[in-house]
Amino acid sequence: MYKRQVYIQTTPGTFATIKIPDLALIGNRVIHRAELIVEQLYDISDSTFRAPDLLYLDASDPSITAAYKYRTIPYDLAIDNTGGLNLLSFGSLPTMDVDGGGNKIRVWKFNLSRYVQHILTGTQSLYNLRLFAPFSFLEQYGLPPGADLTIPVNINSSVAKGRVRVGGGNHPTQRMRLRLVYSKL
């Protein structure tokens, strides 16, 4: 069931599970860009209670045998040359925009292009995604199936600092959505 609003709070707060079941039915295409767009819903209290600095998206992988069943988004979230994750190009840092009422809001655009391409070509499983605002945690990193590394991930600078309301899949004007730019083969 789609929700109109999704509430995300920084660790030890809340998370949202995102399911895109029809993605696997699209068929083989060349993906130029695939992005999950998440828009903040404005509220007057946003000036008092600020949004988290970063949001994070990972994947629930039932094939992981460890107790922690989440992994980085395959192919799109990578360790860069400094040893950190490419959170900026992945979309964890929001951009500022304005909503239909002229209010300043944050918009996150998570880059899922390579992950979606592998789903459509049949080389990658479709996972449920988890959207949250963690402080730090352990994550499985690697390309499934195969040898994974368990890596520590640090996202936000402090615990319990930040909350945000975002549009869910059923919001009338600021719907959470997967935007695909593709070419047919």
PLM features: what roles do these ranges have?
Residues K3-L185:
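Secreted, disulfide-rich extracellular signaling modules
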